[in-house]
A protein has these predicted regions:
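An exposed acidic His-Trp-rich patch
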Residues: 188-217, 224
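Residue-level signal for the start and early helices of compact helical domains
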Residues: 114-116, 175, 181, 211-214
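Short S/T/G/P-rich N-terminal loop/turn motif that feeds into the first structured element of a domain
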Residues: 1-171, 215-308
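Short, well-ordered beta-strand segments in beta-rich or mixed alpha/beta enzyme
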Residues: 121-125, 168-196
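Short, well-structured alpha-helical interface segments that form or flank functional binding sites
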Residues: 136, 140-147, 175, 179, ...
Length: 308
């Protein structure tokens, strides 16, 4: 008897999930970078100065808008804490445990974990200039990167891009590095884009300015991960990393057009319940068998809904 296939948590979509959230993500990235560009004390001083000017010019009534907004926000969160209002921070969260697996070309899933190889590409930048993200050269470099991501996403089936998740570092008080973890179908796709016209245009620009702009740092790391040598697990999580990717598929019941499949499947499948199973490692199984009862409790079938 054939082993049961992995159970997907969603159906194929007409467009990749990440493209549906592109506008909101862009806004969030800009907001995060701007907030990170100055220390908290600097932001408080800016706010205090502006409020002081407003009071001096228009009187103490100018304190009212700030008081109203703060009261609303505090009250809104208290209502969510007490359960009198839906917790909007849980929107999009997948409850229980799930894992990201590569679907077949028809959108179905087999029963073998990590059945395909992947390319993980880390790319980032940092500005070591007093202006931080407002430095003109750094802004130009950032604009090039944003445009390249849009180009990759616009024709992801050809470019081989599966998904990307942006991050901001926290090693410094301000102007931390910005990094994106990107996933590609194969190294050939990544290499082909690297030698394409737009990326080469960006490389040419970098070659022109790098000598005179030592304050702008860029880097990337590439990892080619063979099949059976990677694993993922998420609990009570919104899609992120590989789980936020989208794979081009052509379902048998479709009309021949490309659709996009989320890689997320129920982790309660016997082959997915532990890291040893997900990464196909007999070496690790001996360690995990000692604590099998503890692992099993984290997969309680009555724990919660598997999808939002």
């Amino acid at each position: 008897m054939a082993e049961q296939s992995f159970r997907p948590l969603s159906s194929p979509q007409k467009v990749p999930a990440y493209s549906q959230n592109a506008k909101a993500m862009t806004t969030n990235i800009i907001s995060t970078v701007l907030r990170d560009n100055f220390t908290i004390s600097t932001w408080l001083l800016i706010g205090g100065l502006l409020q002081g000017v407003a009071v001096a010019l228009l009187g103490y009534l100018t304190l009212l808008p700030a008081a109203v907004v703060i009261t609303y926000r505090v009250g809104d969160n208290i209502l969510m804490i007490w359960g009198w209002k839906k917790n909007r921070y849980l929107s999009g969260v997948f409850f229980n445990k799930f894992t990201a697996q590569v679907p077949r070309s028809d959108g179905s899933f087999g029963s073998t974990p990590a059945a395909s190889s992947l390319v993980v590409f880390l790319i980032g930048s940092k500005c070591n200039h007093p202006l931080g993200a407002f430095d003109p050269v750094y802004r130009k470099v950032s604009d090039y990167f944003a445009a390249m991501v849009r180009e990759l996403q616009a024709d992801a089936e050809v470019s081989g891009l599966l998904g990307a998740t942006p991050f901001i570092g926290n090693s410094e008080a301000t102007a931390n590095q910005a990094m994106s973890v990107m996933y590609f179908r194969d190294l050939e796709s990544l290499h082909k884009y690297a030698h394409g016209p737009f990326h080469m245009k960006a490389v040419k620009y970098w070659g022109q300015i790098v000598k005179n702009t030592p304050h702008v740092s860029i880097y990337h790391e590439t990892y080619v991960v063979p099949k059976g040598q990677w694993e993922t697990i998420y609990g009570n999580s919104k899609p992120t990393g590989l789980s936020a990717a989208a794979f081009p598929v052509h379902p048998a019941q479709g009309n021949g057009e490309t659709e996009w499949m989320s890689p997320n499947v129920d982790a309660r499948h016997p082959s997915l319940r532990s890291a040893a199973g997900r990464i196909q490692s007999d070496y690790l199984k001996g360690y995990e068998e000692k604590h099998s009862e503890i692992w099993d409790k984290t997969f309680d079938v009555d724990y919660g809904d598997i999808a939002p």
